[in-house]
Amino acid sequence: MQAYIFPTTPGKGKQGLLTKWNEKTNSGYGLFIDDDSCLSLMIGDGAGQVMKLSSEKKLMRKVWYLVAASFDAETGKIKLYQEPCVTPTNAGLGMSLLHPADETTAFVEATNNLQPRANDAPFLIAASTVNDRSERHIHGGHYKEALTPIELPEQGFVYNGKIDRPRVSKKALSKSEIESLARGYGGCSAELRSEVTGAWDFHANITNNIASTHIIDTTSNHLNGFIVNLPARGMTGYNWTADEMVYHHKPDEYGAIHFHDDDIDDARWEVDFTFELPDIIKSGIYAARLRINGEDSPETEDFIPFVIKPPKGKATSKVLFVLPTNSYLAYSNDNLATNSVVAELLAGKVPVMSAADLYLNEHREYGLSTYSMHSDGSGVCYSSRLRPILNMRPKYRHWLSPSLWQLNADLHLTDWLEEKNIDFDVMTDEDLHVEGVDLLNRYQVVLTGSHPEYSSEKMLAAYESYQLNGGRWIYLGADGFYWISEYHPDNLNIIEVRKGEAGTRAWTANPGEYNNAFDGKYGGMWRARGRIPSKVCGLTFTAYGFDVSSYYKREPDSKKPECSWIFEGVGENEVIGDFGLVGGGAAGVELDRYDLEFGTPHNAFLLARSENHTNLMLQVNEEIHFSVRGYHGGGTENPMVRADMIYYKTPKDGALFAPGSLSWCGSLSYNEYNNNVSKILENAIQGFLKEGPLP
């Protein structure tokens, strides 16, 4: 057995590399990292005897190694190889030139007459079998090559790190044969190829993407397999030269998969119950209330949210609310309150955590958010809704926001729409991705949520086309359309987010790993692909701060005949939104600005601008090229720290209205819904609903 490995937590304890080993019966064989951080081979006869051979040289973190073990059953000879393979580029941000290499190089020989007992454990890469059966299966969806259900073993001792070019042979190979096979199965002699049982090249099925969960055995045995729980693909391999930064331009240098012991794509829970909803229920956001013994308390009650959509292809209202479910997924089960070193600094206070936060801190098996780090310190780039998402609950209070965040904050809007008797349908980001502009064109007015931060390419195209086709769009958030997020091509329950070289971000992808596995395109900020948000919605993300929110004052454009109808019932000098449920004001948490240099339409009207933000409200870092004292300060001294309210007309009697603040909707219900934030939004929606040209 052999492979190139790039361990990222070699000191974390026993981890399986290449194993056909059953932990319960101590039978079979396996190549492991042991409890001493060394490479080891284990052979078990299933009768209580286990042979372990260790390299006795510690593996170093973020260093590529060629590792191999050979066992001659006739002679009992065992050989174990551990050799670093370091180049100036292949470790990315890890170690480069290693001196001296012999500190972590090993060649160990031994003799052993113990024979490995055959077992029913599958051959695993990056884990070891604890029990042969788990009663959990993979089939269909992103496992489309699994034509019938395949039962998974209960695995353990999961490896953290990369693996490239694993091989298994049916004879004990010499060192030169190991090195020849490591370079490539196809380049080996016919004699050596005949001895190889499996040669898995993870780059073999790279096309214009590498979304596949199938792994290819390049031998004539075709022992193809599956990667489970979506470890990261499109990863630089042991031979990455940095000549190409895109994996499908030079697939041979992207033969690695990065495995993590906390990867999850699907909890694989069984269905407990189903409930058929009557047709008379209108479109909206609902929840299934679950209770223990019918008791109403935080300890005995939970709410599982879901959306009831209008009949397929039909609109049942003139107004559509697009629920920003991509953003919900990106933040799902985030653990920043317990893990981030800057949580208290961001919030300006000690984070107030809920029971869900504390539970998730202890139960990492529910998976992480794209704001989290894996246990080895690498960023989480996939998020799936096929698991319990404990911070996507109607009663959840997020630790970061001054009040509510994501789904809960968007319920401020639906509550207000109900209060104002404005009929509306609800659809999701996923629906928009699938149906495109045809979905939006069924509605006269389209509303966003408070934080539509994550968008796919098809979603952006739909919003742009809607505006060109006379659509009337109200963007009710901030930090919108900021990060690229793409759906898995075979399973829309899963999104991918790569955090690139710029942006206000929780982590940064390693060099050469900026391109999405799901579509092969550059990940990170839409700005980096020339699609800055202000070209989509007229505003661009400018500042963030999580202590208190502020207010707006009207600008001269608001009094022009084309715009004054939006402010009907609002005084010329009236302070707008110095109240609310999110930080005490309508302008807060995250802010967007009007900027003609960055794509705000030249016909846009600047209606109002926020002021008096604190110094915890800071400008986004992608616009800060030098850190200069006193130049890029907080809200009291930086003119870029502001929320701009805008309005502009689009072709065919279309228009856009946007207040430029994430906390805007939190002010709608103040004073029994009788306030100027509520009045402005009601004027905008009712004006957009009128037939004919706008003023």
Please provide the spans of the model-predicted regions.
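Aromatic-Pro/Gly-enriched surface loop or interdomain linker
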Residues: 230-265, 295-439, 692-693
